[in-house]
């Protein structure tokens, strides 16, 4: 397993090599796609990318938590969280890549 993290610049470079756009056009394309995903999530909409997965918004209700060090009860406010659910295709691809190692 690699310690390398895929970055926005890596994505832009890959688009540059695979598609043949200029480096600037590739960076702009990646930025545009990520902005569209972010904007839709911020607007409360889920995002589904076929064969990759879905970004879903879930509302969590408020509850009472406990500080593990002191044992004091602490209220935790209701909040909206972002959840990623990988597609079956992605799960199988990751599983097959791990079994090859």
Swiss-Prot record:
Recorded GO MF terms: DNA binding; structural constituent of chromatin
GO CC annotation terms, alphabetical: cytosol
SUPFAM superfamilies: IHF-like DNA-binding proteins
GO biological process, one term: regulation of translation
InterPro entries per the UniProt record, alphabetical: Hist_DNA-bd, Histone-like_DNA-bd_CS, IHF-like_DNA-bd_dom_sf, IHF_alpha
Transmembrane helix keyword on record: no
Domain of life where this protein originates: Bacteria
UniProt KW keywords: DNA recombination, DNA-binding, Transcription, Transcription regulation, Translation regulation
Subunit structure: Heterodimer of an alpha and a beta chain.
Function according to Swiss-Prot or TrEMBL: This protein is one of the two subunits of integration host factor, a specific DNA-binding protein that functions in genetic recombination as well as in transcriptional and translational control.
Family affiliation: Belongs to the bacterial histone-like protein family.
UniProt protein name: Integration host factor subunit alpha
Protein source organism: Maricaulis maris (strain MCS10) (Caulobacter maris)
């Amino acid at each position: 397993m690699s310690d390398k993290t895929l970055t926005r610049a890596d994505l832009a470079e890959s688009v540059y090599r695979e598609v043949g756009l200029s480096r600037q056009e590739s960076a702009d394309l990646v930025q545009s796609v990520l902005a569209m995903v972010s904007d839709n999530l911020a607007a409360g909409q889920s995002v589904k990318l076929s064969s990759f997965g879905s970004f879903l918004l879930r509302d969590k209700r408020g509850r009472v938590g406990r500080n593990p060090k002191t044992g004091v009860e602490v209220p935790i406010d209701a909040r909206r969280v972002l959840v990623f659910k990988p597609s079956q295709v992605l799960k199988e691809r990751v599983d097959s890549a791990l079994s090859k190692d």
